[in-house]
């Protein structure tokens, strides 16, 4: 900007303010008391604007920000962890906040803005405010320890399951409700001898032969391959389900979240 243009802009500002901001003499120009006061505040304002622009640039280019996720222990450990590792390597300056809660608690955090996205066990009740995207198909299978090896070879009918000691997740779990619903639809009521809040504990208890339990097959491959657990075929089997990503509709997606979602390998849509 040329000097005449600067001088004209200052005079226009003085006219608008109704007071001279500069004292002009043959030896130079210096600010009036009003000019000094205005400059002090404008300097702060311009500094804040510049800082805001820099922070915005950093967020857009993934140089700062926060990724806030809600999910259960099982989903975090068996599905999200590899993506979180890759994300952190790509964007080390993004703060990652993962809150481990049940499906319903995660949805509550999503609705109150505490997290930007949930990765939860499906299905959930339809809600027009939620955008649900399946991520991976999973299969619930019945397993037992060495004591039940013969049962694994023979298989069983669901109606006979109440004859055996059963270990299940607590009834607040969406996975537990899914198993209960499956059993009830087939005329069977499940009465576990023990209810636990952790899938890992169910696996550990089943390994020491405390009872049978339902696990997610895809997340229990190591125990099955090492023969610490044995899959018991049940007729009818539990219908397959999915782990899904849930976001609030009509809510802008933070750049930090978009960068994470771009890493996830979603199932291809079938024609």
Predicted ranges, named:
Residues 102-115, 121, 174-232:
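Hydrophobic hinge/microswitch elements
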Residues 14-31:
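A short LG(V/I)-centered, amphipathic sequence patch enriched
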């Amino acid at each position: 900007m040329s000097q005449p243009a600067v001088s004209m802009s200052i005079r226009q500002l003085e006219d608008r303010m109704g007071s001279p901001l500069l004292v002009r003499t043959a030896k130079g120009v210096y600010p009036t008391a009003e000019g000094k006061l205005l400059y002090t505040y404008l300097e702060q304002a311009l500094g804040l604007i510049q800082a805001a622009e820099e922070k915005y640039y950093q967020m857009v280019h993934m140089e700062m920000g926060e990724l806030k996720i809600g999910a259960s222990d099982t989903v975090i450990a068996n599905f999200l962890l590899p993506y979180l590792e890759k994300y952190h390597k790509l964007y080390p300056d993004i703060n990652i906040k993962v809150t481990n809660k049940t499906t319903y608690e995660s949805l509550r955090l999503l609705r109150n803005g505490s997290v930007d996205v949930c990765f939860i066990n499906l299905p959930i009740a339809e809600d027009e405010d939620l955008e649900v995207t399946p991520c991976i198909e999973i299969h619930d299978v019945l397993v037992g320890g060495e004591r039940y090896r013969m049962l694994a070879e023979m298989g069983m009918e669901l109606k006979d399951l109440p004859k055996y000691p059963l270990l299940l997740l607590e009834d607040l779990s969406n996975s537990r409700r899914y198993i209960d619903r499956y059993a009830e639809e087939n005329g069977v009521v499940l009465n576990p001898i023990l209810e636990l809040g952790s899938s890992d504990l169910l696996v550990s208890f089943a390994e020491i032969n405390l009872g049978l339990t339902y696990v997610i097959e895809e997340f229990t491959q190591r125990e099955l391959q090492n023969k610490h657990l044995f899959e018991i075929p049940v007729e009818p089997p539990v219908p397959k389900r999915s782990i899904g990503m849930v976001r609030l509709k009509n809510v802008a997606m933070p750049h930090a979240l978009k960068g994470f979602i771009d890493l996830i390998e979603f199932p291809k849509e079938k024609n």
